[in-house]
Design a protein with these regions (language model features):
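Conserved small/polar residues in nucleotide/adenosyl-binding loops
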Residues: 1-6
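A short, acidic, amphipathic alpha-helical segment used as a generic capping/interface helix at domain edges
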Residues: 70-78, 109-113
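Nucleic-acid nuclease catalytic cores
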Residues: 57-67, 77-106, 128
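Domain-level recognition of nuclease-like catalytic cores that cleave nucleotide substrates
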Residues: 93-144
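A short acidic/basic microdomain associated with nuclease active sites
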Residues: 13-28
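Short, structured patches in soluble enzyme cores that scaffold and shape functional sites
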Residues: 26, 37-39, 48-50, 90-92, ...
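Conserved catalytic cores of phosphodiester-cleaving nucleases, focusing on short active-site segments
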Residues: 35-63, 76
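Charge/polar-rich, low-complexity and marginally structured segments
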Residues: 26-29, 33, 66
């Protein structure tokens, strides 16, 4: 599975969540956020992160340094303060994993940015998946 698979499966999942409007690849600030949605008058931003690293039954992100991921978290925190409802969704691409933690040994800045985003009101979602040889399906959502 790759990042495109994560975004595709989240797009399919979002279509079932009752939004009035969904737009992928939305520019906010200096970033391209994975999804912009509307429900009534409320505006939402969602950034998707695919989690494929597991250590002792826990998912970790990122598996390699991602300056872009840090930047996206800062943009989401700013958007949350500007009135958007924002979330980062970790698509867990391994069965049996129910949470994702920041991989601070690989990139401590991501852990700091995630904590700051949460403090600003950005929701953290864990999207648990059923993984097949050629398929990926979201089967459960948990809050982080």
């Amino acid at each position: 599975m790759c990042i495109r698979d994560s975004n595709k499966v989240v797009g399919e999942w979002l279509a079932k969540q009752g939004y009035d409007y969904i737009r992928p690849e939305f520019t906010y600030g200096k970033s391209r956020i994975d999804f912009y949605m509307e429900k009534g008058e409320q505006k939402y931003l969602l950034e998707v992160k695919g989690c494929t690293l597991e250590v002792d039954g826990i998912g970790y992100f990122p598996d390699a340094p991602t300056e872009r991921g840090v930047k996206h978290l800062h943009e989401l925190a700013q958007a949350q303060q500007a009135g958007y409802r924002c979330a980062v969704a970790f698509v867990i691409q391994m069965e049996g994993i129910t949470e994702v933690r920041p991989n601070v040994s690989t990139q401590p800045e991501f852990g700091t940015a995630l904590a700051e985003a949460k403090a600003a009101g950005v929701r953290v979602l864990f999207l648990l998946c059923r993984v097949g040889r050629d398929s990926l399906e979201i089967v459960e959502q948990r809050e982080g």
